Amino acid sequence: MSKFVFVTGGVVSSIGKGIVAASLGRLLKSRGYSVSILKLDPYLNVDPGTMSPFQHGEVFVTEDGAETDLDLGHYERFTDTAMTRLNSVTTGSIYQAVINKERRGSYNGGTVQVIPHITGEIRERIHRVAANSNADIIITEIGGTVGDIESLPFLEAIREFKNDVNRNDVAYIHVTLLPYIKTSGEIKTKPTQHSVKELRSIGIQPDLLVCRSDKSINEALKKKLSGFCGVSINSVIEALDADSIYSVPLSLKKEGLCKETLNYLELEDKKCDLKNWEQLIHNLRNPGGPIKVALVGKYIELGDAYLSVVEALRHACIEQKALLDLHWVSAEMIEKNSAETYLNEVDAIVVPGGFGNRGVNGKIAAIKFARENKIPFLGLCLGMQCAVIEWARNVAHLPDASSSELDPNTPNPVIHLLPEQQDVVDLGGTMRLGVYPCRLTKNTTGKNLYDEDVIYERHRHRYEFNNYYKQSFLDSGYKISGTSPDGRLVELIELENHPYFLACQYHPEFLSRPGKPHPLFKGLIKASQDKLTQSN
């Protein structure tokens, strides 16, 4: 029988509920409990798959092909547990399900209302995660801020939820902000008091308060919050701003978050084993020399658009005892100037995924610069497609080569639409999504990095390498180091006589974990270190 923890947020948005939920998951797992975490998002989109990265940040793809909120990436990285499409719920998906049931006559002609039908569907989704995962503890993060009209059905649903189970099977955690007023030199508790009052008004009494602050909270403040908010003083948890998100589990452990949560759930506070995590933080805080990595993208104004890529680079640098010196490079600025202007001093170049024409020629120019100047390079999804186009134009004597996505009239579509995508009209959830196998070719860098015959990687694309051009690429020096098991889809390519030049059709960043960096990212950083050592 699963226990349930609900994480809400107050005072301001983007307060770090996802990191708190993920950190609690890490702490529970370190005590031997199995955990699954789901996100309830209050927007009307069915999923974030068609949302602009500027609006939402990256789309995180699960093993079963769901396009989800980036917080699921945090959940997976912190707990090292794969989530599924059940772990991502939006208002849009809830309403869609309820309306479909109404159309099928599932409500027997009754009036369909927010209460009980919408809230009932939300509760059902939470129970479904528990049944599917069979986890000891289900952590649910409610998106938005207490007081937002969009979040009300979700808050009502988690209020009702305590009637579905025993009271000791549920714990409510409220993440809030304690602002520091410089002019008075005081930390203010009033916003938190009002946020808790708002929660109470809809029938939820938080069991724990996680208080974000950039100043330490003394016992007097904790006592004040305890009295006004109706929680035990031991359940007022200080959450100071951290130097890294990966240090948050350690600080919350010190504050007793996990111990107090287990106390409310009437579960044993087992011995906590965080030795590997502590070593990770030690390595993070004591790096070796810097590695200058250029991330050449089109959404660089919002770093969250490439969140998993950045974290994968960070994991690799921690493992290799290097300091990540990340350079955000606009592909459009390369088009306006030159690749050399922005990339001349970097040690490695990464070209991540994306869609559409904007900035593509800048990405292609960056790849050419990496190839010609022997700079370690890694291309992801569209990054691989751009690498194919660059080689076709500049080496394989196909100067007018392109992708049929970028130029439908190109005479040499070295990248073309997947056959199964030919008749697809809808955009949402219709790409090649989720985990697919890839067979690696012997005597290649890719095979050596993975040390496996068959790997499983997550995908999100509509276009692929055009096999009509495969032989001409092989003849001109390209190596295909990974394909689908039937050999039809090219998944991984590389170049010989280069320190490190690999590009993949899949998204390896989604499988990178702190303490277990992805082989392609680890290989990139190691190659950069080796090249620096040789040059010195």
UniProtKB/Swiss-Prot annotation:
Record-listed L-glutamine binding positions: 354, 382-385, 405, 462
EC number assigned by the record: 6.3.4.2
Residues reported in the UniProt entry to bind UTP: 13, 188-193, 224
Cross-referenced InterPro entries: Class_I_gatase-like, CTP_synthase, CTP_synthase_N, GATASE, GATase1_CTP_Synthase, P-loop_NTPase
Positions of region (Amidoligase domain): 1-267
Chain residues that bind ATP: 14-19, 71
PROSITE patterns hit by this protein: GATASE_TYPE_1
Known role: Catalyzes the ATP-dependent amination of UTP to CTP with either L-glutamine or ammonia as the source of nitrogen. Regulates intracellular CTP levels through interactions with the four ribonucleotide triphosphates.
Additional note from the record: CTPSs have evolved a hybrid strategy for distinguishing between UTP and CTP. The overlapping regions of the product feedback inhibitory and substrate sites recognize a common feature in both compounds, the triphosphate moiety. To differentiate isosteric substrate and product pyrimidine rings, an additional pocket far from the expected kinase/ligase catalytic site, specifically recognizes the cytosine and ribose portions of the product inhibitor.
PANTHER family: CTP SYNTHASE, CTP SYNTHASE-RELATED
Family of this protein: Belongs to the CTP synthase family.
Name recorded for this polypeptide: CTP synthase
